[in-house]
């Protein structure tokens, strides 16, 4: 399995269990998810082991169900909010941080990143009202923000991430 992590915070953003598509210019990764509902807090008897007593009533435990996009739930992404002005301020600082990381780790990616990033940011800002914003589990404001939107069918969620802001870890 391959896990994609934020190069700034080290937060897990997504893995290769999803359908991943690279943008035409190679700047963005589009990750397709699904809407899911899962029970939380429910303990499966098979995990406990032993036999359930027939004499004593099972006290059980409270369980709740959580619904959302599988990418967000599985990787513990945290929702945050931005408007056009605040996202513009964030993305300027983020681009500088990614550029600095690229200069250390992949100097050959700096020029393509700086050349293509403004066009991607312009696309994002033009569509900003449709996006939901998610940080990694640490909620570090300097880290990557994943952008969640839905396809034209209104049902299929997908997230967009800057490819150069991710590091790949094989498990």
Curated annotation (Swiss-Prot):
Spell out the disulfide connections.
none
Q: Which Gene3D superfamilies match?
A: Metal Binding Protein, Guanine Nucleotide Exchange Factor, Chain A
Matching entries from InterPro entries are given as: Mss4-like_sf, Mss4/transl-control_tumour, TCTP, Translation_control_tumour_CS, Translational_control_tumour_p
Subcellular location, in the record's words? Cytoplasm
What keywords tag this UniProt record? Calcium, Cytoplasm
GO cellular component, alphabetical, reads:
cytoplasm
* SUPFAM superfamilies tied to this protein: Mss4-like (SSF51316)
> What are the recorded GO MF terms, alphabetically?
calcium ion binding
**Superkingdom of the source?**
Eukaryota
The UniProt entry lists the main location of this chain as cytoplasm
Q: Which residues form the TCTP domain?
A: 1-171
**Family membership noted in the UniProt record:** Belongs to the TCTP family.
| Function noted in UniProt | Involved in calcium binding and microtubule stabilization.
Protein's name according to its UniProt entry: Translationally-controlled tumor protein homolog
From the UniProt record, report the name of the gene that encodes this protein.
tpt1
């Amino acid at each position: 399995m391959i896990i994609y992590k934020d190069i700034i915070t080290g937060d897990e953003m997504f893995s290769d269990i999803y359908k991943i598509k690279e943008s035409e210019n190679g700047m963005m990764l589009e990750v397709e998810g699904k809407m899911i509902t899962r029970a939380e807090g429910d303990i499966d008897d098979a995990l406990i082991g032993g036999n359930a007593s027939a004499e004593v009533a099972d006290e059980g435990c409270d369980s709740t169900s959580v619904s959302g996009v599988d990418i967000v739930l599985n990787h513990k992404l945290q929702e945050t909010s931005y408007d056009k002005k605040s996202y513009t301020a964030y993305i300027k600082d983020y681009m500088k941080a990614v550029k600095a990381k690229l200069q250390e780790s992949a100097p050959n990616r700096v020029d393509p990143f700086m050349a293509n990033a403004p066009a991607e940011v312009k696309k994002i800002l033009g569509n900003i009202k449709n996006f939901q914003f998610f940080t990694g589990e640490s909620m570090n404001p300097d880290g990557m923000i994943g952008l969640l939107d839905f396809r034209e069918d209104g049902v299929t969620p997908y997230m967009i991430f800057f490819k150069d802001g991710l590091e790949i870890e094989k498990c």
